[in-house]
Amino acid sequence: IITDHHTCKDRITTAAAAILNPKRPDCDYPFDALAGVGVAFKLILALAIKNGLKTTDVFNQYVDIATLGTIADVVPLLGENRVIVDKGLKILHNPKRIGIRAIMEVAGVLDKPLNASTIAFSIAPRLNAAGRLGSAATAVELLLTNDESRARELALLLDTENKERQQTERQIFDEALELIAKDPNFEKKKVIVLAQENWHQGVIGIVASRLCDMYYKPCILISHTNGVGKGSGRSIKGFNLFDALTHCEKQLIDFGGHAVAAGLNVNMSDIDSFIKEINKYADEVLTEQDMIPTVDIDCPLSERSVTLENAKLLSKLEPFGMNNEKPVFALAHAQVMNIAPVGADNKHLRLRIVKNNQTINCIGFGMGEFAEFIHQGDTVNIAFQMDINHYQGNETVQLILKDIKRK
């Protein structure tokens, strides 16, 4: 039995007894956005029904694992996915699995407020690190073990592998930027396609995502060995990557994925024609307006509404995630009190603003470069999400910056 959740081609040929995939053209299941783990979870529940087991007990036994996978797979947090994550987070607040407790402790989030974002940025990368750099066996053993000391050992190993993954990611990212700098036609291309020998397969997708965000262009990174390249791509709103690869299938060995993320195999002898064809397709599909990143603001907010009480009320709408994002607000005509880059490589931004004698603290992840052109005393408009900062037992309202515009 094969379980999958990737977009299928029209014809599926296999010797399998069954293929469970809500995206099959002949599947009429009403919710087709399940993560891979969600499809496997549904199979487990079906087997429970078949064998006369109490489905509530089986659901509660595995929903924590299904939650981790659903968040890590970055699928739309709607419908059944949202139900799975909502139920799973309640269990993960006090995890019963020894391995999950161990990885949460190593990540520094055990016994702290937990939401989908915590899983996405603190837990999922560590669990994924083993599979990205080699074998996923370490993560599997962690989730299965009943030995506390072994769980601690495995969690520390995954934490180390995650740091190695981050180092490899930085190296590939820097090499990708060098390739971009050497391309005289880069600005004319709507799709970034970069190829390098022996880039790490498990990391190129993350780097493609970073470049996609940085340049706001679809991006495909390809690692090649012995004349064959394996690629991973990420896309922007308005450009269906699976459709684009379908259009270019004559240049590819094979491919698969979704609208926003996909993988491919290509003979390097065909790479130039592939780059030409996918950019030709992008020229037909994407307008200049599509290439301009936007921040969708749900509503303007006055400084009087930026309170801890309102931040707590918003948190009751959790879980938030893809296609069900936390509301984005706008605050106009605030004055900058302090601004500074913070974190490793000054990658992030710490900002303090004031309006009508109310001081507000903000953090901008990946926005460190804003400190170069926004200064103390400037008047700014900001787009933000309201959050709660937990520090030494105290709670304060904190704004997560999405954009800043100087007046």
Where do the language-model regions lie?
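Short gly/pro/ser/thr-enriched loop/turn and capping motifs at secondary-structure boundaries
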Residues: 6-11, 26-28, 226-229, 239
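Hydrophobic helix-and-loop "lid/oligomerization" segment in the mid-to-C-terminal part
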Residues: 49-270, 290, 294, 300-301, ...
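Mid-to-C-terminal polyanion-binding domains and interfaces
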Residues: 150-154, 160-194, 247-407
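Short acidic, glycine/serine/threonine-rich loops at helix termini
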Residues: 11-15, 31-33, 76-83, 204-206, ...
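N-terminal small/polar loop signature for handling phosphorylated ligands or for N-terminal nucleophile
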Residues: 1-13, 19-22, 171, 175-178, ...
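Short alpha-helices
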Residues: 13-52, 59-71
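Structural motif
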Residues: 1, 17-19, 38, 189-193, ...
